[in-house]
């Protein structure tokens, strides 16, 4: 099986590009006849027949037999061969990793979540990331050479086309994707985490079929993914979606981006954590008091757990964050938007303040 045309961004031959488009069509639409592919791609039947035949020879496409019809010649149905290749996905959070492997049709084979990991802008943290990915791959009943690529979600400013991350792991001149490829020996793609989530929601989520959406991701930080006319909007150098860094408050709180008063300073997981510490020091009570007193690490999962256990201080602050977020969203002129707040099951704590009349 040859994978050169599939993985190379330099293969600009007409045949290579059309083969990629055919594979993308089957990934998005499932099994289909040659006539259906021709109609969608505006290509002739001889051209598509030849390309699909070559993809069959390479092992990417299978012939699933004749389609049942009411009359006339029965066309063959073709679809992706699920075992022809695999893709690994890596989601990097502030204090954990989520890893998954999908077959060539996009079906999940295995998912491992909440793997302990500390995200830091250091070579040691990058090496630890590679160790975790290697351990996951080595545990799979799949030959390493059948993994076609690894997609890695990273927070902050990411240029997916050049392979650079400008917010984390930016201590070398080379693109981060190249550094990771040298360490893992597998093709690497990096992308902003919120943009990836937005695209996944567009393909399979509650807004499937809509062409224009905003995806708002509230985790330790705050960002948005933008879909315009069915396409991901990247902006200049891939820096679109920095919603959390609009100048919004007169609070003199220094954001990690270097500015003061960013929306993220009052509407994010880091804002929840900072405000919780401030209120506790002022005399408020919380079930996280013992951890605070002991100087233990408190991550987003600890804050979420406190909310689920109905810690009143955490809930009160979460409601304030919801109200702040609503004020920010009110300025976004869009018909459909999706809000993701990591693992919060009782949405009423923050959704109701977010949707107050004076906001939305």
Set out the residue ranges of the language-model regions.
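Short, ordered coil/turn segments that flank beta-strands lining enzyme active or ligand-binding pockets
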Residues: 83, 104-105, 161, 228-229, ...
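ATP-binding/phosphotransfer module of carbohydrate and carboxylate kinases, centering on a glycine-rich
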Residues: 1-64, 69-72, 77-113, 117-145, ...
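Short glycine-aspartate micro-motif
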Residues: 87-91, 147-151, 213-217, 223-225
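Glycine/GP-enriched mid-protein hinge/lid loop-to-helix segment characteristic of carbohydrate kinases
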Residues: 111, 121-125, 184-305, 346
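Hydrophobic beta-strand positions
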Residues: 101, 157-158, 226
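Glycine-rich phosphate-binding loop and adjoining helix at the ATP-binding site
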Residues: 109-212
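Flexible loop residues that form catalytic
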Residues: 155, 218, 342
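Conserved residues at the C-terminal ends of beta-strands
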Residues: 153, 249, 340
